[in-house]
């Protein structure tokens, strides 16, 4: 007979396991609605909240034999119940999902998880979400993407009226029951500086010296992380790097994955996704162009890419770099994509042969002092997505440049699957199925698996839309995985962007193999972008080989004939 004033319901986990969902799925919605009706019968003014399910970790013993899929079906059923009954839907899944260590038995949250759930309920009841908050990308000197509807989103207390204004544009909205709010402003033309103002009745945020221009995310592993001051052209280019309209957001790791054992405080921070240093947008001013400062420590490839865009487009350019040395592709893919499309790579990842041996060994050394069986590491599948992509909160960007693959070159077949998942994962995150994605083909390090990997990267040009590949092997080093000649590579990425994204009359690439045919005992190779083809040094062509059906290759003499190689 007790009629509660507030009711919070979290039901459905036990419908996934024990395994009664196949037998009782048809009763779930009906029974849930009857439960809600019973509380309303006891108190007609009751406030009812129902929760999306807490996660189930992929290490659950029956994850792939129904539990994963039934969990997803029940989530949808709960959302339908909320819509049908008009009760408030709260989310226990989202705040726990990036922290699988909290699910000690793969199902039940520990005390830390219970605290997060309690916070979620408290905020839902009170509407207190900590007031107006923005993504860490919102700082003075930021660059906003031009010429597209500009979405600005954040958190505020439930029901708070939020006003966003920039230039002559202003939009107002109200924060939802979950504290989230979003406005979409009319497109901004390239220019500035502007002041971006975001306010509620209690809080007034202002961001000064804001520009509208082209924003690109620059990501990958160590060759993207490789700093301008380390490049072979640094001495000449750093003194000339000052540019008020080139802005840099440099996300650097708090701890490098060197050959060391990390201490307990580091390990705990990693578990809570506190891996990147706090940073802010920096301007390429003369002071910042000095050695050992913002531009000198920024990614060389990203800098040369951005500089070529600046010179060619004559608009502001903002570069966000979150590259992490040694990181494998799988670390950058969202958890749901791997759970549903490549779950094998998640299982016992530190002992998993899909993960490169060096990656596993370095991670094992770094976390050696941890007693937590679910200890996290930057190289773990999903980790860098959850710590380095998710916090960007869909900040509007034009596209992505990517240099990675060294930590996946041992298994090009798996990488092909992972790379496609990566591109789709990020496009889904930014809600842009055509998000440009331009990547670097691995260099000419003398490792047996790398030619096969490079060929796989080349073939993916024809398998994924809106991508481009910059060749780097002619500027590589057979003995050094980190060649210092970065300027041509960054500019080659820029040529893809200028041609494909900005429709400029620029040839995007050197010759790219299209096909072969045999005539008179000779092989004729055809190429895209092959007009005017010649050797880079003016000497006879080198490094060509041919094979019979047995697959054994032999050196071959090659020459350019028109737009073909014979």
Locations of regions flagged by a protein language model:
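Alpha-helical cap/lid subdomain in secreted, periplasmic
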Residues: 2-129, 308, 381-473, 477-514
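Extended acidic/polar, glycine-enriched regions
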Residues: 153-236, 312-314, 563-566
């Amino acid at each position: 007979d007790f009629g509660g004033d507030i009711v919070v319901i979290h039901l459905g986990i036990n419908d996934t396991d024990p395994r009664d969902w196949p037998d009782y799925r048809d009763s779930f919605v009906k029974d849930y609605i009857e439960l809600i009706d019973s509380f309303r019968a006891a108190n007609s003014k009751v406030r009812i909240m129902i929760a999306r399910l807490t996660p189930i970790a992929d290490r659950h013993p029956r994850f792939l034999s129904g539990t994963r899929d039934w969990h997803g079906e029940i989530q949808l059923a709960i959302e339908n119940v909320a819509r049908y009954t008009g009760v408030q839907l709260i989310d226990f899944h989202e705040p726990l999902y990036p922290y699988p260590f909290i699910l000690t038995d793969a199902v039940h949250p520990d005390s830390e998880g219970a605290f997060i759930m309690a916070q979620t309920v408290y905020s839902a009841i009170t509407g207190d979400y900590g007031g107006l908050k923005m993504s860490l990308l919102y700082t003075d000197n930021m660059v906003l993407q031009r010429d597209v509807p500009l979405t600005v989103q954040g958190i505020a207390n439930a029901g708070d009226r939020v006003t966003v204004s920039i230039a002559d544009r202003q939009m107002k909205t109200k924060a939802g029951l979950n504290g989230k709010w979003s406005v979409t402003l009319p497109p901004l033309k390239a220019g500035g500086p502007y002041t971006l103002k975001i306010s509620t009745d209690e809080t007034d945020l202002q961001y000064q010296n804001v520009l509208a221009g082209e924003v690109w995310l620059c990501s990958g592993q160590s060759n993207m992380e490789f700093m301008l001051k380390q490049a072979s052209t640094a001495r000449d280019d750093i003194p000339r790097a000052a540019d008020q309209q080139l802005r840099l957001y440099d996300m650097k790791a708090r701890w490098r994955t060197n050959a060391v054992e990390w201490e307990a405080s580091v390990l705990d921070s990693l578990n809570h996704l506190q891996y990147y240093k706090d940073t802010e947008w920096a301007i390429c001013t003369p002071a910042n162009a000095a050695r050992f400062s913002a531009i000198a420590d920024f990614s060389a490839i990203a800098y040369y890419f951005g500089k070529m865009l600046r010179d060619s487009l004559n608009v502001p350019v903002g570069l966000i770099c979150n590259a992490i040395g040694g990181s494998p592709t799988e670390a950058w893919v969202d958890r749901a994509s791997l759970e549903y499309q490549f779950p094998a790579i998640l299982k016992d990842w530190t002992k998993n042969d899909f993960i490169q041996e060096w990656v596993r060994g370095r991670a094992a050394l770094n976390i050696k002092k941890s007693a937590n069986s679910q200890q996290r590491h930057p190289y773990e599948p999903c980790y860098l997505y959850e710590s380095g992509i998710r916090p960007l909160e869909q900040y509007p960007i034009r596209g992505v440049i990517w240099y990675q693959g060294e930590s996946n070159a041992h298994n090009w077949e798996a990488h092909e699957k992972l790379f496609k998942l990566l591109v789709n994962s990020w496009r889904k995150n930014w809600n842009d199925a055509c998000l440009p994605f331009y990547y670097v083909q691995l260099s000419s390090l003398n490792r047996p698996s790398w030619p096969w990997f490079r060929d796989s990267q080349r073939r993916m040009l024809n398998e994924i839309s809106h991508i481009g590949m910059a060749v780097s092997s002619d500027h590589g080093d057979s003995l050094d995985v980190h060649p210092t000649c970065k300027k041509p590579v960054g500019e080659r990425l820029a040529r893809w962007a200028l041609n494909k994204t900005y429709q400029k009359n620029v040839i995007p690439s050197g010759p790219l193999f299209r096909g072969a045919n045999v005539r008179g005992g000779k092989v004729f190779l055809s190429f895209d972008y092959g007009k005017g083809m010649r050797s880079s040094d003016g000497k006879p062509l080198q490094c060509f080989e041919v094979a019979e059906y047995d697959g054994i290759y032999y050196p071959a003499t090659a020459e350019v004939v028109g737009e073909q190689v014979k």
